[in-house]
From Swiss-Prot:
The lineage of its organism: Eukaryota, Metazoa, Chordata, Craniata, Vertebrata. It comes from the Eukaryota. The modification Phosphoserine is found at residues 17-18, 20. One of its GO terms (biological process) is cell differentiation. The keyword NADP does not apply. This is Ankyrin repeat, SAM and basic leucine zipper domain-containing protein 1.
Length: 475
């Protein structure tokens, strides 16, 4: 009964099904007698027992049958070897036994390598990682592709195996290789929504600008598949090519990747990467991961970092090269700074009409910039809290600031209305003054139109901030 449930397990890795559901691996009851097998069973019967022992993972029987003369590289129906089958089910113990007996780790069938089979196996990452490590230790090539031009790292990235991806790169796997559709490992990770894989690949030097054959970048693939957090991360990342592990030697990289603590070994759990905070994501995105510990030691937050002056950068040990990267990132993220030019705090009575009109035009223009900035924020702000990439403080803080903004805009609207009424009063008095020479109608109409537009713009800005306030309150 249990044996029958296992029928059909060996399926070719990488999503490429074999021509048979069981690939020649028949499952049945194993008659384990105490007699020695060597020389007592016909070769065909030994092969059948060998296949059945492989299927149920009976390591001791496999060893016994190998001792009886079965070839470790014998091929069964459809060309599968014992090692390929063991890799397909992520049986690390069987893989080790077969490799120790001389199995060929570089064997391939129809462009399907054993390493690809292991990377696309169905099993725990712990077992898959052990199998991959064993195969790589026997010189399996991590850059040999299947018929679809997919390499082992692409399969590992697609299936979400972060440790396997890092191990393959440590053994020379090319990060930016593209398959027949132009997908890289990063594209596959973005498509499947594996955030930790995306972060690890960027750290290892993956190029987020490489496009698929239909012209899509990894960020666009993530967005198309509704992985908005990854889309934000890839759009935010400015300089992914400075992978911090790229300059290490192979041995140092392997040591760095595979260092485990006693608890991890005890529980057989490989590291799950902790969620990045806003500071870590920002530094990672611009290639300054090495500054993380320094800034944390000095209790420097992302907000503090982005508002530092040049002397503060130097005081905190931030080099000029790193300063340039931070300032470049800040320039990209920053809303255009509002400049009111040389407007004085008090307008002199001798101010000309042209100068006063210029003041109103500047004020109106800056209000327009503010409206556009708020509209952009509303458009880009995620409607779901789960889609926020960076860590946020309490929403109450944002709501309180929005309330202050609404109050300020209301005050501004009130003052502009007073200004409009005052100007209208002056205009009426001048029109009723018999000594006043009437100006051309076009000028008066133009001035009135400007004032109306200014008032409408300010009122519209106030309404927009009121809507923004309601939006934050709902969240």
């Amino acid at each position: 009964m249990a044996a029958g449930a296992l029928r059909g397990l060996p399926v070719a890795g990488g999503g490429e099904s074999s021509e048979s559901e069981d690939d020649g691996w028949e499952i049945g009851y194993l008659d384990r007698t105490s007699q020695k097998l060597k020389g007592l069973l016909p070769i065909e019967e030994k092969k059948e027992k060998f296949k059945k022992a492989m299927t149920i993972g009976d390591v001791s029987l496999v060893q016994e049958l190998l001792d009886s003369g079965i070839s470790v590289d014998s091929t069964f129906q459809y060309g599968w070897t014992p090692l390929m089958y063991a890799a397909s089910v992520a049986n690390a113990e069987l893989v080790r036994v077969l490799l120790d007996r001389g199995a060929n780790a570089s064997f391939e069938k129809d462009k399907q390598t054993i390493l690809i089979t292991a990377c696309s196996a169905h099993g725990s990452e712990e077992q898959i990682l052990k199998c991959v490590e064993l195969l790589l230790s026997r010189n399996a090539d991590p850059n040999v592709a299947c018929r679809r031009l997919m390499t082992p790292i692409m399969y590992a990235a697609r299936d979400g195996h972060t440790q396997v991806v890092a191990l393959l790169v440590a053994h020379g796997a090319e990060v930016n290789t593209q398959d027949e559709n132009g997908y890289t490992a990063l594209t596959w990770a973005a498509r499947q929504g594996h955030k930790n894989i995306v972060l690890k690949l960027l750290e290892l030097g993956a190029n987020k600008m490489l496009q698929t054959k239909d012209g899509k970048m990894p960020s666009e693939i993530a967005k198309r598949n509704k992985h908005h957090e990854i889309f934000n991360l890839l759009s935010f990342t400015l300089n992914p090519l400075e992978g911090k592990l790229q300059q290490l030697t192979k041995e140092d990289t392997i040591c760095k990747i595979l260092t485990t603590d006693s608890d991890r070994e005890k529980d057989h759990i490989f590291s799950s990467y902790t969620a990045f905070g806003d500071l870590e994501v920002f530094l990672h995105g611009i290639g300054l991961e090495h500054m993380t510990d320094l800034l944390k030691e000095r209790d420097i937050t992302l907000r503090h970092l982005l508002t530092m002056r040049e002397d503060e950068f130097t005081k905190n040990g931030i080099t000029s090269k790193d300063q340039q990267k931070i300032l470049a990132a800040l320039k990209e993220l920053q809303v255009e700074e509002i400049q009111f030019g040389e407007l004085s705090e008090e307008i002199k009575l001798e101010i000309s009409g042209d100068e006063f009109l210029n003041f109103l035009l500047k004020l109106n223009k800056q209000c327009g910039h503010l409206i556009t900035a708020v509209q952009n924020i509303i458009t880009e702000l995620p409607v779901n809290s789960q889609k926020i990439t960076l860590e946020w403080a309490s929403p109450r803080n944002f709501t309180s600031v929005c309330e202050e903004l609404v109050n300020n805009v209301e005050d501004l609207s009130e003052e502009v209305c007073k200004l409009k009424d005052l100007i209208q009063k002056l205009q009426n008095e001048r029109e009723n003054d018999p000594t006043h020479i009437q100006l051309r109608e076009e000028v008066s109409t133009w001035n009135s139109r400007i004032l109306k537009r200014t008032a409408i713009t300010v009122c519209g800005f106030g309404f927009l901030l009121f809507i923004c306030k309601l939006t934050f309150q709902r969240k």
